[in-house]
Amino acid sequence: MNRQVIINADDFGMSAGVNRGIIDAFNAGGITSTSLMVNMPGFPEAVQLAHQYPDLSVGLHFNLTMGRPVSDPASIPSLVKEDGTFRSGAAPQGWDWRDVHKELAAQWDRFTSTGLRPTHLDSHHLLHQDHAEIYKVMARKAYNEGVPLRRSQVAHPLSGVPAPKMTDFIMLDTYGDDKGRERLRQHLLSLRGGITEIMCHPGYEDEVLMEPSPWADIRKQELALFTSPEVANTLAAIGVSPINYRVLQRRKPSARSRARYRSKSARTRRLLPSQPYAVLQRQSREKRKRSINEKKVPFRYNK
């Protein structure tokens, strides 16, 4: 089976600096796809850039943890604080899943109102990986709209949930440390037959990203990596085809996808990402009070 890879940059639309970083990475051949946040300050500019670069695959980065909702906050009270902004961090107890449905529909509609159509669906802070109920909502939306859903590293044992198209494998890692370049190279060399998604977060620092955060350094380091010719050159040298989510849209759902998400008896198994990403997820929930632990555990494929 041919080896193909989608390199997706998250957070398109977050800010002008992130937008510029993603476009520079795309022009350098370092990424093939991105995911758009429709409720963030850089959204209008990101839409213009998406029209300007039609070969860039742009999906919806469903956001429930940052900024203000697209819906009237009063209509989704379980998702917001008193000031109308999202509750930050992981999904809290007490969310009304009807509110999640409503906000996903509102974000989808804002995206399509621009004349663009999402090529895929994923979530900010990987909420559909960590929360089975959010996965259900997003899986139904992706299936009904005929777009792929980002593969989860957690096998949610669900019955009666449609199986949208998705990649065969996914690599969730960050590359903002001294060993990031070599780690990415090893990930590329280890790609197996089928379609794998690699996630990244390139971006230039700007006013929106000035708040002290471990992500600021990660974005700058990943920007340097994914705008270098090294990624495209490595893919060419090892015979891996860079593709985007439009290619996956045209493929029939794989047996792996159907078995994984239709089986009621499937065993729930969490496959850990590399340690830097896991640490950052925990820091987000704890308001980033702890420093980054750069220890690394062996990366494992999601299968």
Which role does the model predict for each range below?
Residues A9-F12:
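DG-centered beta-turn motif at the end of beta-strands
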Residues M1-I6, A16-S57, R68-L116, H120, ...:
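Terminal accessory/targeting
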Residues H61, H124-L126, H201:
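Histidine-centered divalent metal-coordination motifs
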